[in-house]
Amino acid sequence: LWLFAEALDATGDRFAMHGFSSRRRDPVRVHTLKSFDERYGGHVRGRIAAIKPGYYTRMGAALRHGSNMLSAQPAGRRLLLLLTDGKPNDLDQYEGRYGIEDTRQAVLEARRLGLQPFCVTIDRKGNDYLPHLFGNNGYVVIKNPAELPKRLPMLYAQLTA
């Protein structure tokens, strides 16, 4: 994530980075790593270095939160990039079909706002459910997490070309 942030900063593009986790519907925790208005520097690097995995993946809520922030930005192309390790899930019956359909609805809502949602996952089973959520060209499965530092900047360049 740190290397990707460095690469994003080098492009000169405005960007924000957030992490999220959940334990039931309330609250979905959103951790600001870098806001759009914040300059990339030591404080941001420290937040990125300190992030740890936690709890569950209530993807629909995270996408809606990101969509609200991103839709307020004046940029012509607005990429909503989701980096995840698995499919939508949470404790309160957000498993299976409900989590999948809520996430799919959040993706459709993002597109209606003029955003470009795209998912990057390290979940080897991602091809089983991500086409339904993001469409055939709206995601990529990176099976080896060690490839993320190399692949994310290249993917960003392709998505924003």
Task: Identify the role of each PLM range.
Residues 2-161:
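Acidic, glycine-rich A-domain
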